[in-house]
């Protein structure tokens, strides 16, 4: 049984935000079903606790780039992170960023979902060539029971619909939720 919704719209913070509350409000207004805190300068434990209390009932994940620890409803790991050795609670989500099918295959052994991409040019990866959308299609066929969330340049409804049509279980974006 998947811990994810049938279709996820994942809002990822930019590396820095002026107001995490305003960002969350905007992301939720644009339809985000999950928030991922990926901050260059992590919040203090006190700030994080107060923010989490204000946003009780909203699913949010802690990105490994924001620091160690297990906070929120889950943790998202980079492709180069070591897989976790324990899960704080059975309902706690683990996700992983993947940039190819080999990384994705490894993620299926321990993660609850994976981000796969990037599929379009992005400001966060300006020097890296995007993956062809056929990679997403192949990934969904190879791992039909594993939730794959497309990431990278999903800034418009037509791009999002392409990901859905190819079988992605959702999309993750920074820019889409800032518009």
Regions found by a protein language model. Name each.
Residues 1-75, 82, 87-113, 144-146, ...:
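Conserved N-terminal beta1-alpha1 strand-loop-helix module at the mouth
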Residues 78, 116-117:
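Flexible, Lys/Arg-rich cytosolic regulatory linkers and terminal tails that connect or flank
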Residues 119-120, 176:
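Flexible glycine-rich beta->alpha loop in the catalytic core of nucleotide-sugar glycosyltransferases
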Residues 120-126:
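A short acidic, helix-capping loop that chelates divalent metal ions and anchors anionic groups
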Residues 128-137:
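Charged helix-capping and loop-helix junction motifs
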Residues 137-138, 161:
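Active-site phosphate/pyrophosphate- and oxyanion-stabilizing loops and adjacent acidic/basic residues
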Residues 170:
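Active-site hotspot residues in diverse enzymes, especially metal/ion-binding acidic/histidine motifs
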């Amino acid at each position: 049984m998947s811990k994810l919704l049938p279709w996820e719209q994942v809002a990822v913070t930019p590396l820095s935000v002026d107001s995490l509350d305003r960002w969350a409000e905007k992301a939720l207004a644009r339809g985000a079903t999950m928030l991922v805190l990926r901050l260059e300068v992590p919040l203090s434990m006190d700030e994080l606790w107060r923010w989490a209390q204000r946003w009780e009932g909203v699913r949010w994940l802690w990105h490994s780039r924001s620091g160690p620890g297990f906070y929120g409803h889950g943790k998202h790991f980079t492709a180069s992170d070591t897989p976790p050795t324990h899960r704080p609670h059975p309902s706690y989500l683990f996700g992983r960023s993947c940039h190819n099918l080999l990384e994705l295959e490894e993620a299926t052994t321990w993660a609850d979902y994976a981000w796969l991409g990037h599929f379009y040019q992005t400001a966060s990866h300006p020097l890296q060539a995007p993956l062809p959308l056929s990679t997403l299609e192949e990934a969904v066929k190879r791992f039909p029971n594993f939730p794959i969330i497309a990431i990278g340049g999903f800034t418009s409804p037509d791009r999002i619909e392409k990901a859905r049509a190819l079988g992605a279980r959702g999309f993750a974006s920074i820019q889409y939720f800032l518009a």
